[in-house]
Amino acid sequence: MLLIKKAELEQTLREDSQRLRGIEARIKQNQLADDALDVVIKSVPAQLFLSIRTIIPSPEEMIELVQHIQGVIPSRVNQRVLGPFAGIVYTDSFTLTNNDVELGYLLKKPVDDLIVISEEYALQMRELPAVQTMATAVQSGGPELVFLALGRIGQWIEANGYRIAGPYREIGLELSNLSTSDEMIVEVQMPVERLNTTSALAATTRE
């Protein structure tokens, strides 16, 4: 019984800690409201991606997997071949649990081998499709602040008559140790497409 109680208390503390980080992030969002992130529209070419796709149960397990990949892959793949670390989020709505994600490294050149990093995980190369219209925003700070960039892109999409056209990507422009991640710089990339006149008119009518 004591072990069960201990586990329940530890779970409660983890959940409270996540909520606190969310509150702190929202406070910081309000502080940064007058210094809005710029949204840049660009086309992104097809890219080679050494990756694994999986369902991640919790933020803690996400960090563990990211650290594991970052700890193993640079010693198994030539550094001149590795591009930035990247992630793709396939989950439709923002959630802290059970996210469908793809994690790995963008590549400058092909690699041939399946790279096994544990009994559970192996990374394999594939090609990410080109995106003609990608809405992007660069965000610095911890990973919990990525939603600032997502929010800014969402505002741009709504204001300019676009819609989301695929899963969004996070590209690590500068990644510090994840235990002290305040200096991380991440580019959020959201595929978008312009709404046609009929769809936009129908949406306005529904409102």
Model feature map: region roles:
Residues M1-E207:
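A solvent-exposed interaction/effector surface
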